[in-house]
């Protein structure tokens, strides 16, 4: 799958993991109904699939995508100028260019804090009862405050 295939699900205001799962595993309902897999296991596996496709932890990926969505008017043209093409690149490669673009546009004094926030392990990893998407987004104010 190219980056576009992933981003059409993950770059929405609320990432559409349910539809992504059904696209990747079309027989999922049958597997859950037959008891071959539990629904909570499906989401855990899907987060790992996102991690593999992105070559970084899923929470870092979702936060990067969130920053791109909020700041698309700034980052979109920069990504194009850097040759980032989500139609031909993997999700991992596209996210690499996105991260370099974000860091390049940021005040160097603020990169450490940005990276700490980006890579912070979410509570849902520590406490599986929490909703994974509640704490994944980095709001516009947080991003802009890091830019200088």
Report each predicted region and the residues it spans:
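Charged interaction scaffolds used for protein-protein
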Residues: 2-19, 23-148
């Amino acid at each position: 799958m190219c980056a576009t295939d992933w981003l059409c699900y993950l770059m929405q205001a609320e990432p559409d993991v349910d539809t992504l799962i059904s696209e990747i595993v079309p027989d999922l309902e049958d597997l859950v109904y037959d008891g071959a897999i539990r629904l909570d296991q499906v989401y855990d596996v899907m987060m790992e699939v996102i991690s593999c496709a992105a070559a970084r932890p899923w929470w870092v990926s979702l936060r990067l995508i969130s920053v791109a969505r909020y700041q698309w008017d700034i980052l979109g043209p920069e990504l194009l100028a850097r040759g980032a093409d989500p139609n031909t690149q993997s999700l991992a490669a596209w996210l690499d260019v996105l991260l370099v673009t974000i860091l390049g546009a940021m005040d160097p004094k603020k990169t450490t804090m940005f990276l700490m926030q980006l890579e912070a392990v979410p509570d849902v990893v520590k406490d599986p009862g929490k909703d994974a998407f509640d704490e994944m987004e980095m709001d516009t104010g947080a991003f802009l405050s890091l830019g200088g």
